[in-house]
């Protein structure tokens, strides 16, 4: 399936990944080989009793998580809050989404989308 064949209503979104990142960048999701992927939504839930910062990266194959590929860099998430990014993101085969949290394992990140 090419990117042109994706539409926001072509298939129900499904959970692609769910992780609780630590203070070092952790792979959340990697688009499989020979696939194109669409991320429909990223949910960030702060399950900690205080504010925590998150950083989320979109990496091409062979890249490492740095400030130059951060989609969100040290974004503060208040306690008991869910941040929702529902803007579509398109990944090529081997592209990776990684994340870290300032307080380690105090947020849950859930990724919804489609592999085509």
Task: Say what each PLM segment does.
Residues 55-59, 110-112:
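Beta-strand signatures of extracellular beta-sandwich domains
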Residues 35-41, 90-93:
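Short, solvent-exposed loop/turn segments enriched in Ser/Thr/Gly
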Residues 1-36, 101-116:
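C-terminal interaction-tip segments
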Residues 62-96:
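Intrinsically disordered, low-complexity Pro/Gly/Ser/Thr-rich segments with frequent PxxP/GP/PP motifs
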Residues 59-64, 116:
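Short edge-strand/loop segments of extracellular domains
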Residues 47-50, 61-63:
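Acidic glycine-/aspartate-rich tracts in secreted/extracellular proteins
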Residues 28, 54-56, 97:
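Hydrophobic beta-strand residues in large extracellular and virion-surface proteins
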Residues 44-49, 102:
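Short solvent-exposed strand-capping/beta-turn motif centered on an Asx-Ser/Thr pair
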């Amino acid at each position: 399936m090419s990117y042109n064949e994706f539409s926001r209503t072509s298939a129900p979104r499904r959970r692609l990944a769910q992780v609780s990142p630590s203070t070092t960048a952790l792979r959340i999701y990697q688009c499989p080989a020979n696939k194109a992927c669409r991320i429909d939504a990223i949910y960030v839930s702060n399950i900690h009793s205080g504010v925590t910062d998150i950083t989320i990266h979109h990496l091409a194959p062979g890249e490492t998580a740095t400030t130059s590929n951060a989609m969100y860099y040290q974004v503060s998430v208040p306690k008991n809050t869910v941040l929702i990014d529902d803007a579509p993101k398109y990944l090529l085969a081997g592209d990776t989404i990684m994340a870290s949290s300032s307080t380690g394992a105090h947020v849950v990140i859930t990724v919804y989308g489609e592999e085509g």
